[in-house]
Amino acid sequence: MEPTEKPSTKPSSRTLPRDTRGSLEVFNPSTQLTRPDNPVFRPEPPAWQNLSDPRGTSPQPRPQQEPAPSNPVRSDQEIAVTTSWMALKDPSPETISKKTITAEKPQKSAVAAEQRAAEWGLVLKTDTKTGKPQGVGVRNSGGTENDPNGKKTTSQRNSQNSCRSSGEMSDGDVPGGRSGIPRVSEDLKDALSTFQQTFVVSDATKPDYPIMYASAGFFNMTGYTSKEVVGRNCRFLQGSGTDADELAKIRETLAAGNNYCGRILNYKKDGTSFWNLLTIAPIKDESGKVLKFIGMQVEVSKHTEGAKEKALRPNGLPESLIRYDARQKDMATNSVTELVEAVKRPRALSESTNLHPFMTKSESDELPKKPARRMSENVVPSGRRNSGGGRRNSMQRINEIPEKKSRKSSLSFMGIKKKSESLDESIDDGFIEYGEEDDEISDRDERPESVDDKVRQKEMRKGIDLATTLERIEKNFVITDPRLPDNPIIFASDSFLELTEYSREEILGRNCRFLQGPETDLTTVKKIRNAIDNQTEVTVQLINYTKSGKKFWNIFHLQPMRDQKGEVQYFIGVQLDGSKHVEPVRNVIEETAVKEGEDLVKKTAVNIDEAVRELPDANMTPEDLWANHSKVVHCKPHRKDSPPWIAIQKVLESGEPIGLKHFKPVKPLGSGDTGSVHLVELVGTDQLFAMKAMDKAVMLNRNKVHRARAEREILDLLDHPFLPALYASFQTKTHICLITDYYPGGELFMLLDRQPRKVLKEDAVRFYAAQVVVALEYLHCQGIIYRDLKPENVLIQGNGDISLSDFDLSCLTSCKPQLLIPSIDEKKKKKQQKSQQTPIFMAEPMRASNSFVGTEEYIAPEIISGAGHTSAVDWWALGILMYEMLYGYTPFRGKTRQKTFTNVLQKDLKFPASIPASLQVKQLIFRLLQRDPKKRLGCFEGANEVKQHSFFKGINWALIRCTNPPELETPIFSGEAENGEKVVDPELEDLQTNVF
């Protein structure tokens, strides 16, 4: 029987002093106290040990350990002592008498403690007066790390503020049995136990990377006990079906100390196989030595294609319409970053969530309260897990309303708020604040300074593509392809999997007849077959069966989807469970329920029809997918006399199609998930261009084909001074390439970073924002929703003007330009009869989208909530961009993606008083950042509504190109030679060698 914890009931015999307000003197105890009952950083031993803390006396003999990495020289006052949050071995189970703890520690204990701290990449912090240990911090150049408030942070753990974690379980089962295996500390266990992810922590300094810690979820998922896990390598999960090639990749990753994310077939203790999405992340010290590995597992058997991943259609394209592995890897990579941060800084979790752990009621009552704060902002969530809840898993959905009972699925696939859940779009008075930026938690989120936060910042600035509109339709439906034998399923929604209990691997490539059973009416089935043969739609009710044999009444609607020629591409099958509305006597669904259900499934089918048209036809050949990239690009009217076009025209006049051989690599400009951008020179000229090269295989595997095709189509439409021109596009055997303008000024993001305070003055913000407004106006007029406005995508031209770039996340729809006649009051009519009223030009994209794309910090609320979005998302992003130019950071940024999304939906907009800004610019940003898109500036009259705001007073919109750029503290071109020594890009040379 596993022992249980027994909290101590013996009260303390000594009373701690209190200050003038009656608060406990915790941080400054009286000098009369020789020592506290529970010394700082000395947690009580777990109840399962039933012995005193041996570290209160001379240290016990320990087995010889591997040498720890060398540490920088510390000051004399930084005395190394063993702290409670290091990886410690089990003390020998013998009775040890308690002795008075003094400041003096044996040298061996000090050396051992410092070694253990070094293995975690940490340093010990001591009190400058007494030399007593005061905490452990991340190693930095200064050698110490203090609390932002100038105080030494302390934390004390007792039996009252924690519960039994999986780490305690694992350690309890091996009491000293594996003395050679270091165990994670109590504080680290406490931090890790707050996460709901399934993961293990392995020791990279030991041979074979033994497991030091396993979460409770790992034991539940695999069926193994802690005694069978701790101290072993994870290979016990492997079996006959585990891919050897994938295992070789994992071994190479571990040897190199790199990250890994992949799906492998593993086996539980009872022999059951399951698909495991494994993400490995290394924990390194400041010298780059790998100390630990975190291995996060997610069982994805329900949603993955599994063995069907490599299944191909006769045309060579994947059998599945969507590649789900790419979706799952994106979410897993983001989720594991939280675990990495917890292992690197175990205390950071409790410090960030429990801002005032020792505050008494009397103290909290005296704190000034903000009248405009929301109730949700006044509550600091607990960082420790308790019976009532816990830290939110980053892969769970965001909910503004109380959550319903979670589904049994092991993976919440979307990881976001469902469309069906209500979103409070009202703007209350507390949404905007003009006070001091004194929220410590917010300040930590908004201004990260540590190395880890900088890594997180780099990740959060990348564009994300989490789901297409099709994937976000949360109804029970499948899509089949009648052009293939037996009309197989090529797409199944997550909701359909939940309803039928089948996994995606089990149904892809199969006909829907597997839902039939003993009581399924064959006459009704014949109606469906006739509709398929005749390519017509039909709506029926029939009994179907789940995988477990449970029957349900299905209101089923079949609808063909036709292409522009009128030929059937797909069949859409929508199911609705009507079992709750069955009349017991007649054993049929109630008539009113049937009518409502039929209307719902038909409406859903229409939405699916529109959504699936965003994707390329699955019956295309791979050559057809990239055919547009081989077309000749024709010159646009406003660019025909420019030097770049004249140079391109000379090549075209020779009759030879432009290809990779016409360009010479100069240097790389950047890289992303699907490709890279290079500076190239047209051979035989001095004309420079930017070439974007995208890997075809990566585009297919990451569901990016339709994005790349849309970007090529969008670039071919553009003819505007604040947007790039497309000069050529071509393909090689492995890549597709786009040739566009090169802008020597670089990114607005880097321009901001070069400024002394990382911000721009208000006149500069006005200049760049005005040009962005004009560029967005043109895009919207062309029916383009940009969807990825951020400083990285605002490039600076040679003359100082801006140009938007990167349209792979943009949406191309239709647009209907309108002329709006302003309404005039009757009293003013007579006065204005002589002057003709100027009509307002408005052109906004007509069709809404619901795909989950954008950049984390710039995504609008309606994208997160799944309510569907229009071009209003670009005006939201403009508000975020202006805020970042003014203050140097975005207003809703969080330490995790989930926190950022929560902030976007809930957090108040605040303008810090540390940087002066006019009322006009604050009002403009506030109106652009309305959570309800119907109330957002630009919704009614488009760009004209934004132009008319008082912040832009004095802007001559017709002659905006003639406006001189503002003077900056650090100029755009700082005198460095633009055409310096040219560096040949090996990657592009290799690409050139493999030209088609």
UniProtKB/Swiss-Prot annotation:
Organism listed in the record: Arabidopsis thaliana (Mouse-ear cress)
Residue ranges occupied by any PAS domain in the UniProt entry: 184-257, 462-535
Enzyme class: transferase
Gene Ontology BP, a term: chloroplast accumulation movement
Topology with respect to the bilayer: Peripheral membrane protein
Active site, per annotation: D788 (proton acceptor)
Post-translational modification comment from the UniProt entry: Autophosphorylated at Ser-185, Ser-350 and Ser-410 in response to blue light irradiation. 2 molecules of FMN bind covalently to cysteines after exposure to blue light and are reversed in the dark.
Annotated Pro residues bias: 60-70
Segments forming domain PAC: 258-312, 536-590
PANTHER family: FLIPPASE KINASE 1-RELATED
Purpose of the protein: Protein kinase that acts as a blue light (BL) photoreceptor in a signal-transduction pathway for photo-induced movements. Triggers the phosphorylation of AHA1 and AHA2 C-terminal penultimate Thr in guard cells to activate them and induce stomatal opening in response to blue light (BL). Also phosphorylates BLUS1, a kinase involved in stomatal opening. Mediates the phosphorylation of CBC1 in stomata, but not of CBC2, in response to blue light. Required for blue light mediated mRNA destabilization. Mediates calcium spiking of extracellular origin in response to a low rate of blue light.
Catalysed reactions, as listed in the record: L-seryl-[protein] + ATP = O-phospho-L-seryl-[protein] + ADP + H(+); L-threonyl-[protein] + ATP = O-phospho-L-threonyl-[protein] + ADP + H(+)
Reported phenotype of the disruption mutant: Enhanced drought tolerance, when associated with PHOT2 disruption. Plants lacking both PHOT1 and PHOT2 have curled downward leaves missing color changes and lower petiole angles in response to weak or strong blue light (BL). Impaired proton H(+) pumping associated with altered increased ATP hydrolysis and absence of binding between 14-3-3 protein and H(+)-ATPase (e.g. AHA1 and AHA2) in response to BL in guard cells of plants missing PHOT1 and PHOT2.
Residue span of region Activation loop: 806-862
Region annotated Disordered, chain positions: 1-184, 351-413, 434-453
One of the Pfam families matching this protein, by short name: PAS_9
Alphabetized UniProt keyword annotations: ATP-binding, Cell membrane, Chromophore, Cytoplasm, Disulfide bond, Flavoprotein, FMN, Kinase, Membrane, Nucleotide-binding, Phosphoprotein, Photoreceptor protein, Receptor, Repeat, Sensory transduction, Serine/threonine-protein kinase, Transferase
Statement: the UniProt record of this protein carries the keyword Signal: no
Remaining remarks: Undergoes a photocycle characterized by fluorescence and absorption changes induced by blue light. Half-time of photoproduct formation is 14 seconds and 70 seconds for dark regeneration.
Residue span(s) of domain Protein kinase: 663-952
Protein name, as recorded: Phototropin-1
